[in-house]
């Protein structure tokens, strides 16, 4: 169950990371509320997952999901670069996430 909670926390990290772009420095109300809500829930779920998962593993996976998810969202929806080097780098992060999951107790 902790792994599912961690996955949801990571996906919410993507929401708030991308949401930051639309807050315009927290000057736009609706995007700011959505972003802050996603931040709070993401952190709460991360904390909950860390009750049974190793801290280093959980945090690294959470940030990895957020980083890869935000980058893919940027590529697919925001017209950001999808260069081979960038895609390879994202693949390496995914490989690291998988390795951490497989090596966890």
From Swiss-Prot:
The chain crosses the membrane at residues 1-21, 29-49, 58-78, 82-102. Residues 50-57, 103-105 are periplasmic. It is a multi-pass membrane protein. GO terms for cellular component: plasma membrane. It is found in: Cell inner membrane. The keyword Transmembrane applies. NCBIfam families: PRK11431.1. Guanidinium ion exporter. Couples guanidinium export to the proton motive force, exchanging one guanidinium ion for two protons. Belongs to the drug/metabolite transporter (DMT) superfamily. Small multidrug resistance (SMR) (TC 2.A.7.1) family. Gdx/SugE subfamily. This is Guanidinium exporter. It comes from Salmonella typhimurium (strain LT2 / SGSC1412 / ATCC 700720).
């Amino acid at each position: 169950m902790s792994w599912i909670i961690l996955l949801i926390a990571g996906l919410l990290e993507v929401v708030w990371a991308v949401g930051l772009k639309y807050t315009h420095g927290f000057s736009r109300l609706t995007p700011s509320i959505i972003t802050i809500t996603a931040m709070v829930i993401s952190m709460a779920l991360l904390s909950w997952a860390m009750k049974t998962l190793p801290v280093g593993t959980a945090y690294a996976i959470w940030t990895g999901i957020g980083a890869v998810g935000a980058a893919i969202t940027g590529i697919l929806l925001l017209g950001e670069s999808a260069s081979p080097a960038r895609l390879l780098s994202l693949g390496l992060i995914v490989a690291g996430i998988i390795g951490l999951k497989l090596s966890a107790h």
